[in-house]
Design a protein with these regions (language model features):
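Short secondary-structure boundary segments
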Residues: 2, 25-26
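Bacterial N-terminal signal peptides that target proteins for export
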Residues: 2-12
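Short, linear, compositionally biased motifs with a strong N-terminal bias
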Residues: 15-17
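Exported/periplasmic ABC-transporter solute-binding proteins
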Residues: 26-144
């Protein structure tokens, strides 16, 4: 009987551990409709979000918008697009700020706040859960 309870507890812990991963939906990297571009590559997004470039290839200024640490969208974006953990990102920006080479992207609280800022500012680029994308923004990159 004890063995069966241990198995059930172990299974419950496993399911709780995996549930955030299973709940992560597709993401969309979005831009203001007036931004002069139709798509971005993963490498371009990487460079923008790590502050390595502040302008698109056509010369347009770009302002990356991040989400708060701990959000599912942020975790998926950094894992799948930037290929870095929250710890690695924090260390990266600490180094960059300390050496005076830049500042991290501005942060918004959630998907909706990111989308609202992108709609209001023609230079903003953000990532959101694909389910909230509508015709007020354009998708320039998709993450499955």
């Amino acid at each position: 009987m004890v063995n069966k309870r241990q198995k059930i507890k172990s299974l419950a812990v496993l399911m709780l551990t995996l549930s955030p991963c299973l709940a992560m939906a597709d993401l969309a990297v979005i831009a203001n409709k007036e931004m002069p571009l139709t798509s971005l590559s993963q490498e371009e997004i990487y460079r923008i979000y790590l502050g390595k470039t502040k302008f698109l290839s056509n010369g347009a200024k770009v302002i990356p918008v991040d989400q708060r640490v701990g959000s599912n969208s942020r975790a998926k974006f950094y894992a799948d697009v930037i290929k870095k953990s929250d710890t690695e990102i924090k260390a990266y920006w600490s180094r960059v700020i300390f050496t005076g080479q830049g500042y991290p992207p501005i942060q918004e609280s959630d998907d909706r706040a990111v989308k609202d800022l992108v709609v209001k500012n023609k230079n903003c680029l953000g990532y959101v859960d694909r389910s909230i994308v509508d015709d007020s923004v354009k998708v320039v990159f998709s993450v499955s």
